[in-house]
Regions:
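Short intrinsically disordered terminal tails
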Residues: 1-2, 61-65
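N-terminal acidic leader/helix
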Residues: 1-28
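Short, charge-rich amphipathic interface segments used for partner binding and complex assembly
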Residues: 27-63
C-alpha cells in the first residue's frame, strides 16, 4: 500500500523535525534570542498534534473496513 508507506515516511520526518526543533529551542534558551522560544514551542505543539493525528490515521488504515 503506497499511501501507507508514504504516510509512515511522513511520520518519521515529523519525528526528525521535532528533534531538530527541540535542539533549536535548547540552543536559543538563555541567549539574546530567548524571545524565539514561544514561537518554537508553538510550532512544536502543532507538529506534535499533526503527528498524533497522522498516527491515528495510520492505525485506522490498518483496520479492516
Amino acid at each position: 500500500m503506497a499511501l501507507h508507506a508514504d504516510l509512515t515516511s511522513l511520520s518519521s520526518t515529523l519525528d526528525q523535525m521535532l528533534e531538530r526543533l527541540e535542539a533549536a529551542a535548547t540552543d536559543v534558551r538563555g541567549t539574546d534570542r530567548d524571545g524565539l522560544l514561544g514561537d518554537l514551542y508553538e510550532i512544536e505543539r502543532h507538529l506534535r498534534s499533526a503527528n498524533r493525528r497522522l498516527s491515528r490515521t495510520l492505525t485506522a488504515m490498518q483496520k479492516p473496513s
